[in-house]
Amino acid sequence: MSMATGVEPTIDVKVFVDKERGKVLFAESGKEFVDVLFGFLTLPLGTVVRLLGGQSQVGCLDELYRSVEGLSTDLFRIEACKAMLLRPINAAAKQCCQLTVRVDDTKHREVYVCADTSCSVTAFSSVTGAVCNCGRIMTQLAGERPENPPNAAASGACEDGAFVKGGMKFIVTDDLNVAPASTSLMLSLLDKFQVPDPSCLEQMTLQFSSVKIIDLLRRSLTSQNPLTGHYLDVAPDDSVVDMLPEYLHPEEQDNEAEHSLVNASLRVLQTKNNSKVLYAEVGGDFVDLLFGLLTIPLGSIVKTYGKSASKGCLDNLYTSIAGSAHGCLRPECQNLLLSPMLAPYFGYGASKMLQVEELAPDKLDINACFKCFKSRGFANHYLCHVEPWCNYQKRYVKICYEKGKTTKLCELDPKTPEGGCEEAAYVKQGPQKFIVTDDLHVLPLSLASTLQVVIEAKLQRKDLVEKEVALTKPQVMELLRAALVTHRALSTVLLPAKINKKLHYHSFCLY
């Protein structure tokens, strides 16, 4: 909501509707709406699931998210690991904070330090529950670090938006192709949609609040016509086949060593007739691989898998950046959207497999001693330099007697207990085993959990067989992709390809 008026901001978008066909053909908007659309590409998958209330209907993501929620914190390396997966930080949060309508409320500028004032470790974490090098939990919130440098767009010093340049109108098609408005584009659209008389189109102005933006996000993930679905308030189209397309990366020619993944060996319980995988018995490293999906931005998924990344039309939005909307983005935002990154230290598992890079860890220069900063935070650390007049002593008296009045803080890895330098996983590595069901729900391995899966499948012992599977890199890539488009990820990838894997897509390109 607007701090000044208390009224939630909205964005006006004019849609052009073909009433006879019951379809929104395209929409016209300013930079505000296009900024929000491009902002979708920066959202981590875990944030998407959370914003959609765990009902995203995007493959197995809802089950993965529920698995993290349900697992005991004892199974993670430290408590912070669970929080990082449930509320991953957006690496482009600085830009997203400038959006007219914001949907992601994740705190990205919070600074946590060790609460022990005697601790001299000059480090901070962006995530609560991290472990200081001294071994204590970093629970002391120092406040939010200021943006440096302050953004001109946020202060109104220029007309540009969060991602796109200002001063122009944009056309957005029903399947989220974006381009600057022009006469040639108008004529092209009328021809494409076979509209001989433009007066037949009905023009409506829609107001998009945060709730409606979230609804549009949901539809963009599952529909080729999100604007029409939103305008007519129709249920998402479920006609798209819930299976993988043909093999994803036939062009890859990895050598044999690269095909063999360390510790990617599964014990699979499946039906003898190869109709279904019930679950896989796995170690913590495989669980980390899956959980890592929740930290990856939508744009990185589209960059890797293209049209096969989802049943929706975010691929059109992505290709517009370097295609029909080329030249419309602020120069510093072009690569940020084409190759979205992870927040510092959020990378592991799936992000390494998909080669998604991390931002460099942040560093803070504090104009105060460390003790004053710890106890007073950003709001009052200036008192470190204050010498108020003391009537009793008839002189100016220092509040702080520390000699060093400046502090340099380095961001530490929240996943690494006690400041270890090795790359840290989210899940504890050790003898603990897990089961991963066909829809990628993760549970600690136990007799009760395995029997429950078999009972729910309504299968007899004679129908079941256990197999050992060693996954190759291409299979892991397929599995991660399957997690985004089907509720039967394990069956789709591990069983013989006798099931129809064809996906049907309907897309309209501007040029």
Regions found by a protein language model. Give the residues of each.
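Long, position-biased, composition-driven segments near the start of the mature protein
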Residues: 1-511
